[in-house]
Amino acid sequence: MEPDWIACPECGLQQSCPSCKKPVEKTWVACPVCAQKLDQPPMIGKEKNAAAILTLERIKDYQDRIRLSSRPFYERFADSLPIKNWLFWILVGQLIMLGHYLLARTRGVNIFDDASWFLGIMIGLTMAFIDKSTKNLRKPFPIMFDIVDEPADEFGKWFMNHLSDGLKDRNMLGYGLLFGSINAALGHIYGVWYEDPVLILSITVQWFLIGFAAGLGFKGGIIIIKLTGNFGKKPLIFNSESIDGCGGSSYLGRKILFDAFLYFVVGLMVAGYVLSSPWENAQAPLIKNLIYSWIAFPYVCTLALFFMPINKIHQKLAKFKAKEQNILRARRKSLYLDLAVDSERCRLMEDAERETALKNLTDVVTELRQVSQMSTWPYNSRNLTQFFATLFIPIGIWFLENPSRFLSFIG
């Protein structure tokens, strides 16, 4: 409840008289000052609507402020153009590929023989994914607010500060430059197959750009882990009757799964490119292990993003579930004892009272079954099935279609 609210926007419970605005208690049937009737929870019309609208307006206000304060340089630039962001980044990737193709063609080199044609596509798709993932960072705010036990202003400022600090241009550029430099250096360590200096420069720039994009994505993953981990330390309110089977937290889990999926797609592209490129030093044992490590890195990031951010939320969901189960089991036991044929309580019960007790027992057993089925992770079984199918099916298909290439590379 906010200090200026007359009533709760969720259940309508009053804390102030809708007529004279004097504080009231939930057990009062009427205001002692103006005699206004107070049926709790009341149907208070305008006052209830005003409280709900106030909350929605604050959420919308913070969403606008969060969007304006957490737009890194690449998103601001793409947003300023008259086309969709994802389309812009894909066009950039196509132009990079076209430039490399024209340079290679003038020198009699076919880029479709060495997989370098795929670099431009990778750059465009990765930047489109990162742009989308950055926008997704802001979307969980209303859902987080819905399950956190904090006032709107306090939580809004906390969320905005965490996101804007993490997405500062300096931080994003630092990670981009670091990963870009490492990726370009690794390409030369693996062994450049070109002899023409212009083509060497062209492919080095592309290695740097794809590494730069990967650095932006890596920093985004760190932001997700920190933001969600710190959120999990806050007082949270779960609902055992939520239809998602996760106490009302599955939306947050789906957003994390989506970002983990993007990491995985980037990992597939990296693996496909690395395994298809004719590296000069690929058969050297040390270089081969280095290549394996670089291929595995996006998949490690995918799994880290899948498990690490929601660990605190998982712990709180587990405690909530255990507490609810203990309460319901105690109620079930009490009702069983009351309804036992040889109990004094049962002998003294009227028929109507016994029917009520039986109905209560049925309700408690049903609720206990529902709570027992609740997941202690913000992922339901459908989310998990989709995620792991997405992970393993493409790898299996690629291996079945290219067994000789894979075996020759690892051999």
List the predicted regions and their residue ranges:
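Loop-to-transmembrane boundary segments
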Residues: R71-G93, F155-A185, E241-M269, R347-I393
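Long, contiguous internal "core" modules enriched in hydrophobic/ aromatic residues
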Residues: S164-L167, M172-G176, G180, A185-A322
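Juxtamembrane boundary at the C-terminal end of a transmembrane helix
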Residues: W398-G411
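Membrane-proximal, solvent-exposed terminal domains/tails of membrane-associated proteins
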Residues: A50-L56, D259, G272-L391, P403
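N-terminal soluble segments of membrane proteins
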Residues: M1, S16-P18, K46-L54, L102, ...
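Cys/His-rich metal-coordination motifs, chiefly Zn-binding "fingers/knuckles"
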Residues: M1-K46
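Juxtamembrane inter-helical linkers in multi-pass membrane proteins
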Residues: I143-F159, L227-L252, A318-R345
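Transmembrane-helix bundle segments that line or gate the permeation/cavity pathway
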Residues: E47-K234
